[in-house]
């Protein structure tokens, strides 16, 4: 279940970033500036009454660009569904997590993959 909870945490943080961007919030690409911006939003990212390190959220800014807000919302919901199905015995953990990872990868914007490949050439 640890992998599932880790995936959920990553997706949830990226969904929150995406939601803030949709509201018109702009995040700096400079980490020192971002740290100051993060103080304004840190309560939004609080998890289990703990505020994550700003650097962790800063690193997710680049990854979040590869997903749409709707895809992130759907993937967060899928994590809940997979957890429920595992706990109720509908599916086994290993294949369920594998399928979830495949869903996450399938939502990754192909444009960014092609852009990355062009940088390698």
Where are these regions (language model features)?
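C-terminal alpha-helical interaction modules of replication/initiation AAA+ assemblies
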Residues: 1-121
């Amino acid at each position: 279940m640890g992998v599932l909870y880790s995936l959920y945490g990553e997706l949830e943080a990226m969904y929150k970033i995406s939601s803030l961007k949709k509201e018109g919030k702009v995040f700096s690409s400079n980490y020192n500036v971002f740290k100051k911006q993060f103080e304004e939003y840190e309560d939004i990212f609080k998890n289990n009454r703990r505020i994550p390190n700003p650097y962790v959220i800063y690193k997710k800014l680049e990854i979040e660009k590869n997903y749409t807000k709707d895809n992130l919302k759907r993937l967060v919901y899928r994590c809940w569904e997979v957890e429920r199905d595992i706990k109720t015995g509908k599916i086994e953990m290993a294949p369920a997590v594998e399928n979830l990872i495949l869903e996450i990868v399938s939502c990754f914007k192909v444009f960014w993959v092609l852009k990355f490949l062009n940088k390698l050439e």
